[in-house]
Amino acid sequence: MIECGLIEKIVSGDDSDPKARIARAAIGEFALRSLDGARIREIAKISGTNVAAISYHFGGKEGLYNAVVAGMSDYFDKIVGPYYEEGAEICAAKNCAAARALAIRFLIDAIRKFSTVKIVPALCLIMSREAASPSEYFQRVYGSIYEKPVEFLARLFITASGGRTEHGEAVVFAQALWSNVRIYSSKSEAILRLHGWRDMGELEISLLEKSLSKVLEKTLK
């Protein structure tokens, strides 16, 4: 399994570790062509290694894909884990205002952090493909990147509404907002054009935060 530290090396741009170079090249190839279509020789070429090195470090293409998915999920869990801990305390205390504030901070911080990571658009493609056509690795992606954050937000929304929002309704609302985090984090051409933005920096994220705050205030009264 690819360790979380290896994904951090990819994010930081550290090319000293051949495993990180292989994984970075693999992320791009899996995003573009899927597991079945990915070209192991192309991954070796892009990473400046060879097929033997990929087999040595990951056991082949299947092992490399498993490592990328596991590393992606572990990296995500490490980023958002502190929010989950804080949310559990807030929900236990039934603090409506704090729950609303944390929901906004969680969503905006996620966009702020992930929109600056160059490999996120490729990771989003891998996530979307797994969601649309699940492989044996789907559960790992689903648990970390779909189920946990949506359930977390749903609990915050229920708490923020003073318990008036039912779980099913909260999940629908949470999923709608969480989907937008992935969309904005990928900084797709469609999103930039829709808003008339040339890029998405701090100014644009601040506008999103203001809009989101208004939506949550009106919805979670």
Give residue spans per PLM region.
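N-terminal intrinsically disordered/low-complexity leader segments
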Residues: 1-17, 87-88
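Helix-turn-helix
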Residues: 21, 29, 33-71, 75
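Short hydrophobic clusters on alpha-helical segments that form packing/core surfaces
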Residues: 22, 26-30, 177, 216
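Amphipathic, non-transmembrane alpha-helical scaffold segments
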Residues: 69, 73, 139-150, 205, ...
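Hydrophobic alpha-helical connector segments
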Residues: 82-120, 170-177
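Amphipathic alpha-helical segments used for helix-helix packing
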Residues: 117-140, 188-194
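Hydrophobic alpha-helical segments that form the core
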Residues: 120-129, 166-188, 207-211, 215
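Hydrophobic alpha-helical bundle segments that form small-molecule/ligand-binding pockets
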Residues: 147-171, 219-221
